[in-house]
Amino acid sequence: MAEGWLNAKLAGKGWLAESAGVAAWGGSPASPEAVEAMREIGVDISGHSSRGLSRERMAAADYILVMTHGHRSEMVRRFPDAKDKIFLVHGFSPDGERDVMDPMGFAVEVYRRTRDEMIAALGDFLVHLAERGELSSE
């Protein structure tokens, strides 16, 4: 959901968001609930396929946004060279660094709440990028 929303917002600005899971094997589609929650706000993630983490993907990233403190700890443990670019998604929010609940296995209503929380936090991240002059106007 985060990848789809960010790419919709960052289109033409010189950025590409890619999601990868801490425990993802790769190749799995987005859940029907995630597809529905994003479709409701005009973002199509029906073609999404999960990806696992790799050293190459970590090295290529400018920012690595994670949903939970546990994910951040695991990623820093596995990829210590990337620790300075791994942030909680709420890390740029005025309400502080808190976890975003994983809605997997829950009803679409939970996906909607998670979507809305992520969008607010990712909006704060985009403000951070803009304030640093990191968004092009292409």
PLM region descriptions:
Residues 63, 69-138:
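Phosphate-binding/catalytic loops
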